[in-house]
Amino acid sequence: MDSTLDAIETHLVAAGASEPEALQMRLVAEEIVTNIARCAWPDGVDAQFLVELTTAMDAGGLHVSLTTIDDGVAFDPTAKAAPDIDADLDDRAIGGLGMFLVREMTDTQHYERANNENRFRVERLLPRPMLST
C-alpha cells in the first residue's frame, strides 16, 4: 500500500500540488484504501482493488479525482452519518472519523454500486493564484 500512496503523492506534486496538498490527498487515499482492505472482504478473501488518480490543470487550478473500485461487500461511505466531534469522548461512537476527514479534505464524494463493484470517487480543486499579464 505504501508504494501506491507514494505514487499518488509524487504524481500530485509533479502535477502542481504543493507538498501539504499532496500530503492531505495521500491521507485521504490512505483512509479510503485502509477501509477497503479492512471491510470489503469480511471472509478474509485475498482480493485486489483498483486505485485511479487523475489530475487536470486549468485556469481554476488543479482538479484532482481519486477513484477506488473493489468487488467487496456493498458499502456506501457517503451514507454514513458524520460523527459528533463536539461530543464528550466517552459518549462518542467508535469509528467514522476517517470518513469525516475524507469529507473535510475533499470537495465532493460520489459512490455507486455497479456490476457487483463499489465505485467511490472523491474530487478536490486545488485553486491556483491568477497570474497577471
Residue ranges and their predicted role:
Residues 1-3:
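STAS-typified acidic loop motif
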Residues 6-30, 34, 91-93:
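Conserved short strand/loop->alpha-helix "switch" segment adjacent to the catalytic nucleotide/phosphoryl-transfer site
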Residues 37-133:
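Conserved beta-strand-loop-beta-strand hairpin that lines the nucleotide-binding pocket
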